[in-house]
Amino acid sequence: LGNNIPEICEAIGSDVAYDKTTFSAYETEAVYEAMDKERKNVLICGIEAHICVLQTAIDLKAAGYQPVIVADCVSSRKELDKELGLKRAEQEGILITSKEAILFELTRKAGGPVFKQISALIK
């Protein structure tokens, strides 16, 4: 439903794009096949929090994954729609966090090169 942002493709070292005509990314065959069935936690960032992000999270939860929506990495055209999408996700038992919280949760400890890189990113 849109193009990839060049800066994101550069940062992750890939410009892989999947055709997506469904609102839920999990209903896209290429995304479904690319999912690592051994990993159960899925971080979700994207646009239209009240539609695409929400439906993807609900589908992932139904499939046995633990979706985690990164609230400051999602948006909607209207702020109210974003707020309602996040509220609905929370009502569905989906975890909501911030980019800073999840980055430090994944880092696990202070000190070292990874901590320094993450700290520099969020300042």
List each model region and its residues.
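Active-site-adjacent betaalpha module
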Residues: 1-123
